[in-house]
């Protein structure tokens, strides 16, 4: 009996990838052991975050960094740092911004439900541009001049959501931001791998970039990384850490917080609810070390071999109602995936039955395009045969019943 079953929940198989709703990646033994070890000892949390800042900064090339409660919390704290700076009175006001300089410019095609992270800190998002290719109205997408045209006395910063095909280029946005002395915040939550992206955005001159620690890095699911300019990371720390201290004898590590630049300790800030435990910080740092040191290309080749087992089993059904395709990205650091396609059966119902009856959670992103996806992140030599066998049997039974 698993720990989940002991308390009334099922253990499932996450074939959806990094999705938070199904728990994200399974932790490696190395990461899990690090978290257990950390749980057995106390630590000054400011010192731990300062040490984490040093380690992460060496990897990312940033001035400083902070371990956050996921990428979304990182975005909230990025906005909070820009809005409040190192001013304790402004930190106390958030999410109210009395100066009204709280607008962040974002492309309409970068908008998503995750924008709430910025608004949570008191930011107002200002949409610009459009994607006429997507709407079928033309050949143009959001262009740099549209960002610049939206800048006014209330503009606090620019938001850039990074994907493989984000437009405009990050270089063009940084150029405009620097011209107007505005910070750029990059949402790169899911932009790993490739590992080069750990340094890419900082090298391009952005001020803050947020990554998920619980996706490809395979750290604790509720962890994240925010890295960038020290003045902003210092503000994040001041608004996140337990500030129940006497200023006279408070000696924060200078690489994280320069005491000489603040006049008083703020009260508990907007980030206090985004507390990150010592165990999560330790797990994230070990996971990051493993991520940058491992032979990721060999891992992707192994992932493809595991998908080929599932692919072979499904194809052995010899059914004309279903087809499969393994998709291999051009970047050798990215996961291959297996698409299960059908024009003839109800894939919505199939996916629902796989979840309900078998505890198999596939990626449903392509359901409206008539395919389900198997992501191999949580496949292993130990579970592949059982998963493949159950998936094959369930699809066979589903087709047999005429669904």
Language-model segments: what does each one mean?
Residues 1-26, 53-67, 71-280, 284-292, ...:
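Conserved PLP-enzyme active-site core in the AAT-like
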Residues 3, 311-390:
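Conserved C-terminal alpha-helix-loop-beta "cap" of PLP-dependent enzymes
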Residues 38-41, 291-294, 357:
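Alpha-helix C-capping/helix-to-loop hinge sites
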């Amino acid at each position: 009996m698993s720990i989940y079953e002991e308390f009334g929940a099922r253990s499932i198989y996450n074939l959806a990838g990094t999705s938070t709703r199904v728990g994200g990646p399974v932790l490696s033994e190395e990461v899990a052991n690090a978290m257990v070890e950390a749980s057995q000892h106390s630590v000054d949390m400011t010192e731990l975050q300062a040490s984490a800042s040093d380690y992460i900064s060496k990897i990312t090339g940033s001035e400083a960094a902070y371990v956050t409660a996921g990428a979304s919390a990182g975005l909230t704290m990025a906005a909070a740092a820009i809005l409040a700076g190192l001013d304790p009175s402004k930190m106390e006001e958030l999410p109210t911004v009395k100066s009204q300089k709280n607008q962040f410019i974002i492309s309409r095609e970068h908008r998503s439900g995750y924008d709430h992270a910025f608004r949570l800190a008191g930011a107002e998002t200002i949409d610009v541009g459009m994607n006429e290719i997507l709407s079928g109205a033309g050949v143009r997408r959001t262009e740099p001049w549209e960002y610049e045209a939206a800048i006014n006395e209330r503009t606090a910063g620019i938001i850039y959501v990074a994907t493989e095909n984000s437009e405009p280029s990050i270089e063009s946005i940084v150029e405009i931001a620097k011209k107007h002395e505005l910070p750029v915040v990059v949402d790169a939550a899911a932009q790993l791998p490739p590992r080069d992206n750990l340094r890419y955005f900082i090298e391009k001159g952005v001020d803050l970039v947020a990554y998920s620690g619980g996706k490809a890095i395979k750290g604790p699911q509720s962890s994240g990384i925010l890295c960038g300019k020290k003045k902003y990371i210092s503000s994040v720390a001041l608004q996140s850490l337990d500030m129940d201290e006497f200023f006279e004898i408070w000696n924060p590590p200078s690489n994280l917080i320069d005491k000489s630049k603040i006049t008083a300790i703020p009260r508990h800030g907007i980030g206090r609810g985004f507390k990150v435990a010592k165990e999560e910080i330790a797990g994230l740092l070990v996971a990051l070390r493993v991520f940058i040191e491992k032979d990721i290309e060999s891992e992707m080749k192994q992932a493809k071999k595991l998908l080929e087992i599932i692919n072979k089993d499904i194809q052995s059904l010899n059914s004309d109602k279903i087809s499969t395709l393994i998709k291999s990205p051009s970047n050798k650091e990215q996961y291959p995936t297996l698409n299960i396609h059908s024009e003839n059966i109800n894939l919505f119902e199939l996916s629902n039955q796989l979840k309900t009856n078998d505890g198999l959670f596939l990626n449903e992103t392509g359901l409206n395009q008539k395919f389900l996806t198997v992501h191999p992140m949580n496949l292993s030599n130990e579970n592949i045969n059982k998963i493949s066998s159950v998936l094959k049997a369930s699809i066979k039974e589903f087709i047999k019943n005429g669904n």
